[in-house]
């Protein structure tokens, strides 16, 4: 056992200055070596419609969140983010008017939800630009935000069908049909605008991030659904996910 004198000498030799922090990108605020900004569109996209992201506060702490990719990929004012657990609050300036707009639609599965593809794209039959509301959080968080915000119950709800497999390959999704916030917003916006190029351009930073991570030791992730079917998922699953998987057809 070390003597008290030795212990104090070792403590005294520890550098009192904090470790050097890595330089961060002034835009995405990620360390420069892992910045995904080079994947953003060369010119910010300016669709007629705009995205309205209602974000759970816990999302801010996630290091690989994708909502900022929408913020910096779209022209200023085309992607508005409001943070909270219920909406609208006094600090959410302008949100009440947006939610009351007849051209506002929300991606959320309800009994009355219609498929997004069934809506007229902007310009068809005089359709004006949409306000597309997306709840940003885990499914339990999104569900809580919806139920805690009565005004959302009066917003026309829509759903995406025939979803592609997520291209966010360095993150494990709950099921094969789950998409990141970026992928959801990009796909939905391209449908409402009738322009598939919007999706392709907005996904640029996600592709850049995944490519960099895979080149530096990350591995491709399969969904929890896929791994459970293959009996390779090590964790216990909740009752809700187990119920979902029981009704899904086997491949």
Please place each PLM-identified region on the residue numbering.
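Short Cys/His-rich Zn2+-coordinating modules
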Residues: 2-19
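Short metal-coordination and nucleic-acid-contact micro-motifs, chiefly zinc-binding Cys/His arrays
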Residues: 21, 31, 47
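Short cysteine-rich clusters marking metal-coordination/redox-active sites
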Residues: 25-28
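Short Cys/His-rich local motifs and their 1-3 flanking residues in nucleic-acid-associated proteins
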Residues: 30-33, 37
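N-terminal accessory regions of nucleic-acid-interacting proteins
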Residues: 37-39, 53
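Histidine-anchored nucleotide/phosphate-binding helix
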Residues: 38, 62-73
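S-adenosyl-L-methionine/SAH cofactor-binding core of RNA-modifying enzymes
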Residues: 75-147, 151
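C-terminal folded domains that constitute the principal catalytic or ligand-binding module
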Residues: 131, 139-251
């Amino acid at each position: 056992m070390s003597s008290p004198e030795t212990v104090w000498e070792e403590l005294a030799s520890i550098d009192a200055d904090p470790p050097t922090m890595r330089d961060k990108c002034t835009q995405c605020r990620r360390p420069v070596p892992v910045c995904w900004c080079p994947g953003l569109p060369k010119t910010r996209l300016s669709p007629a419609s705009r995205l309205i992201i209602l974000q759970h506060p816990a999302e801010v702490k996630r290091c690989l969140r994708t909502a900022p990719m929408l913020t910096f990929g779209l022209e200023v004012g085309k992607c508005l983010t409001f943070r909270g657990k219920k909406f609208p609050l006094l600090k959410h300036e302008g949100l009440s008017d947006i939610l009351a707009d007849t051209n506002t639609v929300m991606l959320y599965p309800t009994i009355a939800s219609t498929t997004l593809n069934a809506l007229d794209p902007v310009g068809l039959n005089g359709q004006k630009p949409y306000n597309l509301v997306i709840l940003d959080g885990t499914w339990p968080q999104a569900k809580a935000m919806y139920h805690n915000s009565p005004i959302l119950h009066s917003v026309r709800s829509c759903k995406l069908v025939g979803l592609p497999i997520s291209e966010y390959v360095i993150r494990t999704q709950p099921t094969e049909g789950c998409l990141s916030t970026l992928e959801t917003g990009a796909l939905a916006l391209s449908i409402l605008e009738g322009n598939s190029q919007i999706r392709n351009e907005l996904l640029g930073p996600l592709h850049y991030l995944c490519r960099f991570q895979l080149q530096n030791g990350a591995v491709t992730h399969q969904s929890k659904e896929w791994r459970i079917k293959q009996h390779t998922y090590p964790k216990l699953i909740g009752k809700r996910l187990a119920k979902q998987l029981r009704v899904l057809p086997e491949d």
